UniProtKB/Swiss-Prot annotation:
Pfam families: Metallothio_PEC. Residues 1-20 are annotated as: Disordered. The keyword Zinc applies. It comes from Arabidopsis thaliana. This is Metallothionein-like protein 4B. The keyword Oxidoreductase does not apply. The lineage of its organism: Eukaryota, Viridiplantae, Streptophyta, Embryophyta, Tracheophyta. Metallothioneins have a high content of cysteine residues that bind various heavy metals. Functions as a metal chelator of copper (Cu) and zinc (Zn). Plays a role in storing and distributing Zn ion in seed. Belongs to the metallothionein superfamily. Type 15 family. Expressed specifically in seeds. It is found in: Cytoplasm; Nucleus; Cell membrane.
Length: 85
């Protein structure tokens, strides 16, 4: 299995990190917090198997509108729990 980096700041792919689930990269797919690289901005994560996390917390279209979820933007038709929070 490929090591994806620092395991302490990673999580499995799911709607909470914005990666497709199941991830096309299999079990090696993880979301890493960019807080170290971006100087503490914890709302944005990157996924080796996808694009940016945080701004698109579920598998909704990237044509997003602001929602009440903390730091999240989701498409109009998005109904995942992360967007509803």
């Amino acid at each position: 299995m490929a090591d994806t980096g620092k395991g302490s700041a990673s999580a499995s792919c799911n709607d909470r990190c914005g990666c497709p689930s199941p991830c096309p990269g299999g079990e090696s797919c993880r979301c890493k917090m960019m807080s170290e690289a971006s100087g503490g901005d914890q709302e944005h994560n990157t996924c080796p198997c996808g694009e940016h996390c945080g701004c698109n917390p579920c598998n909704c279209p990237k044509t997003q509108t602001q929602t009440s979820a903390k730091g999240c933007t989701c498409g109009e038709g998005c109904t995942c729990a992360t967007c509803a929070a």
